[in-house]
Amino acid sequence: MGSSSKKKKEKQKDFQKPKLKVGKPKQKPSNFTDTSFKTKSIVVNQQTLTTEGLDSAELFKQNLTLAVNAKSDNQRRDALAYVTNQLSANPANNPVGTVGVLTKVLPLITDGASSVRVQLLKLFRTLPPQEVRPHAEKILLYIRGGMTHLSNDVRTDTLNVLDWLLEVAGDEVVSCPGGWLKTLNSFSSMLGWNPNVSSAMTTKGWTSAPKATLGMKKGPESQAKQIQVLAKFLQTGFRPEEPLPYKPRAYWDNIYRLPTTPNPFAYLNLFGLPRDEDSEMYPDRMSRLRVFDMKWRAAITSGMETAKKEGGTVGRAAAILDKALKASLESDGSMQVN
């Protein structure tokens, strides 16, 4: 009997409302957890790389990844500086190869920080030219994107990258798929020298149609830089090919030996998408000159004459462009300069 009455009392406790005494807090449940404590947080303004236990190859890869993924401009710049120092060392420390470096850092051409873009150009100049040439087409894709960027500073720094690429891989730039006409289209967007507008020229010269350009808010220096790089691009495309020395076995080597250049049959476009005129390859000087005369000479000549009248830095840059255009005519036996 005693046990049954005890059980009844225990069950009744669950349904009894406890009486609260005035001035005393409510009784805490048995499973109460105190959450009133606070922990001290440590905030690090700048991340640091832990170099302990990492060899030079892993440290190189870590900095290469940080150069692309870091949120801070200073971090990306410092990581690029580390990679640049490793590439310029003697011997160079590059565990991922030139193609691995380019794949990672090419998107930084349009980076929003000027210091990052300047450091990126220094990195490009440390790469071996013979290893850059096979990737000229890939680099040009990012360069053309930077040439049509909304920021004038990005466009100017991109022209510096194109200037470097013309120095180390000029022939590959003008002869790769899309390297000739698509790059000229990008210059057209920057300068506003539209071939469709030039076709509607009047007897007075340049048409009065609106000039669709990406802006000249930085003054004549920006336009002069664009014209100078355009002149260098045209000089590279119109440069006569150097004759190859006579080799009696060259004929048989071309037939039976493996090619010494990457993708030697790219001009056939066996496995790629169909190309339009702008995406086509123009591997020799005569083909580039022919399509230039057909689509671009009138527009560039008209824009050049207008730029020469402005004088100053723009006029001097236009004079360099004029020499490049005249040189293309003089070296062509079928055309004469007036």
Swiss-Prot record:
<comment type="function">
    <text>Component of the RIX1 complex required for processing of ITS2 sequences from 35S pre-rRNA.</text>
</comment>
<keyword id="KW-0539">Nucleus</keyword>
<dbReference type="GO" id="GO:0006364">
    <property type="term" value="P:rRNA processing"/>
</dbReference>
<feature type="region of interest" description="Disordered">
    <location>
        <begin position="1"/>
        <end position="34"/>
    </location>
</feature>
<protein>
    <recommendedName>
        <fullName>Pre-rRNA-processing protein IPI1</fullName>
    </recommendedName>
</protein>
<feature type="compositionally biased region" description="Basic residues">
    <location>
        <begin position="18"/>
        <end position="27"/>
    </location>
</feature>
<feature type="compositionally biased region" description="Basic residues">
    <location>
        <begin position="1"/>
        <end position="10"/>
    </location>
</feature>
<dbReference type="Pfam" id="PF12333">
    <property type="entry name" value="Ipi1_N"/>
</dbReference>
<keyword id="KW-0698">rRNA processing</keyword>
<dbReference type="InterPro" id="IPR024679">
    <property type="entry name" value="Ipi1_N"/>
</dbReference>
<dbReference type="InterPro" id="IPR016024">
    <property type="entry name" value="ARM-type_fold"/>
</dbReference>
<comment type="subunit">
    <text>Component of the RIX1 complex, composed of IPI1, RIX1/IPI2 and IPI3 in a 1:2:2 stoichiometry. The complex interacts (via RIX1) with MDN1 (via its hexameric AAA ATPase ring) and the pre-60S ribosome particles.</text>
</comment>
<keyword id="KW-0690">Ribosome biogenesis</keyword>
<dbReference type="GO" id="GO:0005634">
    <property type="term" value="C:nucleus"/>
</dbReference>
<dbReference type="GO" id="GO:0120330">
    <property type="term" value="C:rixosome complex"/>
</dbReference>
<comment type="similarity">
    <text>Belongs to the IPI1/TEX10 family.</text>
</comment>
